[in-house]
């Protein structure tokens, strides 16, 4: 699984007094790879395409998106539909956070502004990275609800 990345195989060779002649023989048909892709200031599709190695068709990939996005986040479903044929298996994860420009809208005199002000205060008071991630996710879902969008 993803806890053992890269090629798997055995070492074969001969060992004699004062000398060892060993070579790695890959045994696994597929490799597990984790690819972290920063999407700050670019689309997720462009960032993923630029990060991919030449050949992925035989291997199993987990792609973790990082960096900052707008309030909509990343549409993992459409990315999976678009890129899955290029992989034996593809798993996508969104670990992005809401960009700073979204928080600037907290000054609006509106329900959106009130919502963002309340969440920003919680974000500033958060003690752990896990708390911050939950608040970022709450912002993304809340803004989607205010706009009538699905995530």
Can you name each region flagged by the protein language model?
Residues 1-17, 98:
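Conserved beta-sheet core of the metallophosphoesterase superfamily
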Residues 17-151:
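Accessory, non-catalytic peripheral segments of nucleic-acid enzymes
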